[in-house]
Regions:
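Axial heme c-ligation environment in periplasmic c-type cytochrome domains
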Residues: 60-63, 91, 95
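Conserved short beta-strand edge segments in small beta-sheet-based binding/regulatory domains
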Residues: 82-94
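Immediate flanking context of iron-sulfur cluster ligation sites
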Residues: 22-28, 95-96
């Protein structure tokens, strides 16, 4: 009987934790494999659990816990790394620090 209670408690614990995850997509401009590594690393450093950027579609899929971070922080970290997102543009200085192969035609968000 105590095993049923323990099993129920563990099931409830893990199901509640899984609901705390949020998955979002954002547009991030970039060009190459080096961009992919930098963009994904910036998102992870900002608290994303997973980050996967598609260089063809320019879409970053991120999974994160809302208690740990939010999309604003993730996008700001990516912009600080030199990449424009759909809502936050990188500064001219951050963009200028990108390798030549990573400098894309800037069509992203307006500077905020």
């Amino acid at each position: 009987m105590k095993y049923i209670g323990l099993f129920t408690a563990l099931t409830l614990f893990f199901s509640v934790n899984s609901f705390a995850q949020k998955t979002e997509e954002i547009k991030v401009w970039g060009n190459c494999g080096m961009c992919k590594k930098t963009i994904e690393a910036a998102a992870i450093k900002a608290g994303a659990k997973t980050a996967n950027w598609n260089k063809d579609s320019k879409v970053l899929n991120v999974e994160f816990k809302e208690k740990k971070t939010d999309m604003q922080k993730i996008q700001q970290a990516i912009a600080n790394a030199g990449y424009d997102t759909q809502d936050i543009a990188a500064t001219a200085e951050a963009y200028g620090n990108l390798a030549e192969c990573c400098q894309y035609p800037r069509k992203g968000a307006e500077k905020k």
